[in-house]
Design a protein with these regions (language model features):
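ATP/Mg2+ or Mg2+-diphosphate-binding catalytic cores
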Residues: 222-312
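Conserved short submotifs of the Hanks-type protein kinase catalytic core
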Residues: 2-14
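Pre-DFG segment of protein kinase catalytic domains
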Residues: 130, 148-151
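Long, amphipathic alpha-helical stalk/connector segments used for oligomerization, subunit docking
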Residues: 218-220
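Active-site activation/catalytic loop segments of kinase-like enzymes and analogous catalytic loops
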Residues: 161-215, 240-257
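Activation segment
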Residues: 147, 155-157, 254
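ATP-dependent phospho-/nucleotidyl transfer catalytic cores
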Residues: 16-132, 143, 261
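Conserved catalytic-loop position in the HRD/HxD motif
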Residues: 134, 139, 151
């Protein structure tokens, strides 16, 4: 088994914060390659499919992280979907002008609540792999040579899709910001391509790692292999959706959103992101891929709508 932490967890002095780089319009050409390499190579080797099962159980105990998991379970997978009195702590921060939109599309959508409940349950009960647990673009440093990852304090054994989804979701913030603040078409195209390639290359590399590392005969059955990998990517798109939504309406927002101070830009941008998040959550099991999710966001942008008429 490969050592943990994986190789990108090293000195970052020659690297720059990915969130800030994307905000400045610098999209590295090999970013999707680097992100997908890290995800595939750090996640699958820590599963029961590859690890010795006794060692895996020891690792699960060692990396039990209840206090920080509580934060995710509350702030990411509960509170963005509930209003008072069901949400007594009420940490959501909804931009004035979007209150009715949030109430209708997040607080009152029972079908969405059922899907988020499934994702929350998976986060709490699927000790699938050792995950970073907070893998947003502020925890990634990059340059033309590669990436480095920091801040693993949320690490625990959870669903692989949570890390993958956090990466995908945070890339969309950069695209949304550029789309609503007059960013160049070239930058927007580069961001779209990076998202599409990150989605698809991650799926491809997970499959390649699976074929290389998994040797247990039952796990090598083609139907199981397909179901397992499809499940990981379905989780990934779902958690991308919950990450997007929580960064818009929750109390831990991202600079790509908060830096937009003109309500004429901020309000529709937030609605578009919420709209995308709902789409990803509700359609996660429908065989999504990079082309499908970027095409969906292009539709949202092209129509200039504050509400996506058919969320699901």
């Amino acid at each position: 088994m490969r050592p943990w932490p994986p190789s990108p967890w090293k000195d970052i002095s020659a690297y720059k914060n990915l969130r800030k780089e994307l905000a400045a319009g610098r999209v590295y050409g090999h970013l999707s390659e680097n992100l997908s390499d890290f995800l595939a190579q750090s996640l699958l080797p820590t599963t029961d499919l590859v690890m010795d099962r006794q060692e895996k159980k020891k690792q699960v105990r060692f990396f039990t992280n209840p206090e920080l998991c509580d934060i995710t379970e509350d702030l990411v997978l509960t509170e963005p979907y509930l209003a008072q009195p069901m949400n007594p702590r009420n940490k959501n921060i909804v931009t004035p002008g979007n209150e009715d939109f949030v109430r209708e599309h997040l607080y009152e959508d029972e079908a969405l609540h059922a899907e988020v409940a499934a994702l929350r349950n998976g986060f709490m009960n699927n000790a699938q792999a050792l995950i970073h647990g907070d893998l947003h673009s502020g925890s990634i440093f990059a340059n033309e040579q590669g990436i480095k990852v920091i801040d693993p304090e949320f690490a625990f054994y959870g669903p692989m899709g949570y890390d993958i989804g956090n990466v995908i979701g945070n890339l969309f913030f950069a695209w949304a910001n550029k789309a609503y603040t007059g960013g160049s078409a070239e930058t927007q195209t580069a961001l779209e391509q990076t998202i599409r390639e990150t989605c698809d290359k991650t799926a491809e590399k997970l499959a390649a790692e699976y074929d290389k590392l998994v040797t247990f005969p039952l796990y090598c059955a083609s139907a199981f292999r397909k179901a397992y990998l499809d499940g990981v990517m379905a989780d990934s798109y779902g958690y991308a959706g919950t990450e997007i939504i929580r960064r818009v309406v929750g109390d831990s927002k991202v600079i790509e959103v908060t830096s937009v101070t003109d309500p004429a830009q901020r309000l529709p941008m937030e609605r578009a992101l919420i709209d995308l998040g709902i789409y990803l959550i509700k359609n996660r099991a429908g065989g999504l891929n990079g082309a499908a999710v970027t095409e969906e966001f292009r539709k949202i942008l092209a129509e200039g709508r504050g509400t996506h008429g058919q969320n699901g």
